Amino acid sequence: MDIRNIIKRPIVTEKAVLMKEKSNKYTFVVDKSANKFQIKYAVETLFNVKVKSVHTSNCVGKSLKVGRYAAGYRSDWKKAIVKLGKGQEIQLADKV
């Protein structure tokens, strides 16, 4: 798997920004088939940082109401929380 396809996008929410500021953890949406070793290698290669640990979570898509009677679902996705070593930083556009 290509490392550019492993990390899809960063998650920039209030909780993610607080985790970044307090404990140097960054949150990403990643490919569902990627494992922790692939995620660690992709982050270290793309952002030129040293990763301390990776935690992953499979998030189940929510059910939606589409139209009057039909039901639909959002896609399932995978979230990775990456903790960087001391003094490491990733420049993200999280200041709005």
Curated annotation (Swiss-Prot):
Pfam families: Ribosomal_L23 (PF00276)
This protein's record includes keyword Cytoplasm: no
SUPFAM superfamilies per the UniProt record, alphabetical: Ribosomal proteins S24e, L23 and L15e
GO biological process, one term: translation
GO CC, alphabetical: ribonucleoprotein complex; ribosome
UniProt keyword terms in alphabetical order: Ribonucleoprotein, Ribosomal protein, RNA-binding, rRNA-binding
GO molecular function: rRNA binding; structural constituent of ribosome
Keyword Ubl conjugation: no
Family according to the record: Belongs to the universal ribosomal protein uL23 family.
Quaternary organization: Part of the 50S ribosomal subunit. Contacts protein L29, and trigger factor when it is bound to the ribosome.
Function: One of the early assembly proteins it binds 23S rRNA. One of the proteins that surrounds the polypeptide exit tunnel on the outside of the ribosome. Forms the main docking site for trigger factor binding to the ribosome.
Name of the protein this chain belongs to: Large ribosomal subunit protein uL23
Record organism: Endomicrobium trichonymphae
